[in-house]
Amino acid sequence: MATERLVAGNLHNEDQELELSLRPRCLAEYIGQEHVKETLGIFIQAARERGEALDHVLLYGPPGLGKTTLAGIIANELGVQLRVTSGPALERAGDLAAILTNLQPRDVLFIDEIHRLPRQVEEILYPAMEDFVLDIILGKGPGARSIRLDLPPFTLVGATTRAGLLSSPLRDRFGINSRLEFYQVAELEEIIRRAATILQVAIEPEGAREIARRARGTPRVANRLLKRVRDYAEIRAGGVITREVAREALELLQVDAAGLDSSDRRLLLTLIRKFNGGPVGLETLAAAISEEPDTIEDVYEPFLLQMGYLQRTPRGRVATPGAYAHLGIKPEDRLF
């Protein structure tokens, strides 16, 4: 399944301990996303000097780029507590109300996958975000009554991979909107070298670059690949990650020079071989490779679009000339 892919940006269970050990705790340690860092730094400093809660922050972009890490950094920089939850975990309005009423002044509440909040939960967020009040309905039917509770000023940090799915009323209540972009190879090299130092892994500069080139512009993938290449180096190469060792390990793991794995190649080959390169509808393509449409949109497509191997058109998905070239297929070869 896509959730277990080595190069997928979503969080694996085995990633949690690794990410905690590698996660930067302040903006100065955070590598990449320079524009986001600069703007957040200004807003955080201003809120801190005024003794106010920071405006609500929406972080959006593909998975694995550091949204959760930034939420923790915001809380650390403000000197307040971080409360963490997710959209799917908040099934009832009471679940969110319990969290909100236990916040301390200026605390940061982080809601991951905020686009998956149930509507009834989302609606109690509106007055909480705008006026720092919580409206609770007691009872049912004609005898129901509403009471209003004051909340301490707080900062909501919402994270999503699909900002377009947020309702307008919710999106409009975020004062700070920051899109996280894919990382450059040089930035990923720096992240890998930092992680190698923390993990006490011997790595040469060219080894770090080889991993960075195949990490799909995503720090989470870079750290995961480093962990796997470290295992290979310890067993097959005396523990030192050189360029050749990294290349051998990643080829063994079926991660090619562009960062595509067997699942990416299967999607592109299916599009080319079965559907003549497209266009083909999302549902049809998903069925052809036995994946969920949401998985294709959230996990596969961001990187394939970024690399120019795939196009979304009004008529469906289309494989680009770049995809043919990468797979070593001539456009005329697609015809049967």
Curated annotation (Swiss-Prot):
Underlying gene: ruvB
Residue ranges the record marks as coiled coil: none
Domain description: Has 3 domains, the large (RuvB-L) and small ATPase (RuvB-S) domains and the C-terminal head (RuvB-H) domain. The head domain binds DNA, while the ATPase domains jointly bind ATP, ADP or are empty depending on the state of the subunit in the translocation cycle. During a single DNA translocation step the structure of each domain remains the same, but their relative positions change.
Oligomer status and interactors: Homohexamer. Forms an RuvA(8)-RuvB(12)-Holliday junction (HJ) complex. HJ DNA is sandwiched between 2 RuvA tetramers; dsDNA enters through RuvA and exits via RuvB. An RuvB hexamer assembles on each DNA strand where it exits the tetramer. Each RuvB hexamer is contacted by two RuvA subunits (via domain III) on 2 adjacent RuvB subunits; this complex drives branch migration. In the full resolvosome a probable DNA-RuvA(4)-RuvB(12)-RuvC(2) complex forms which resolves the HJ.
Descriptive protein name: Holliday junction branch migration complex subunit RuvB
UniProt family annotation: Belongs to the RuvB family.
Pfam families: AAA_lid_4, RuvB_C, RuvB_N
Its EC number(s): 3.6.4.-
BP-aspect Gene Ontology terms: DNA recombination; DNA repair
Ranges where the record places region Head domain (RuvB-H): 257-336
Residue segments, region Large ATPase domain (RuvB-L): 1-183
NCBIfam families named in the record: PRK00080.1, ruvB
Sorted UniProt keywords: ATP-binding, Cytoplasm, DNA damage, DNA recombination, DNA repair, DNA-binding, Hydrolase, Nucleotide-binding
InterPro entries: AAA+_ATPase (IPR003593), AAA_lid_4 (IPR041445), DNA_helicase_Holl-junc_RuvB (IPR004605), P-loop_NTPase (IPR027417), RuvB-like_N (IPR008824), RuvB_C (IPR008823), WH-like_DNA-bd_sf (IPR036388), WH_DNA-bd_sf (IPR036390)
Species per Swiss-Prot/TrEMBL record: Moorella thermoacetica (strain ATCC 39073 / JCM 9320)
Chain sites annotated for binding Mg(2+): T68
EC category: hydrolase
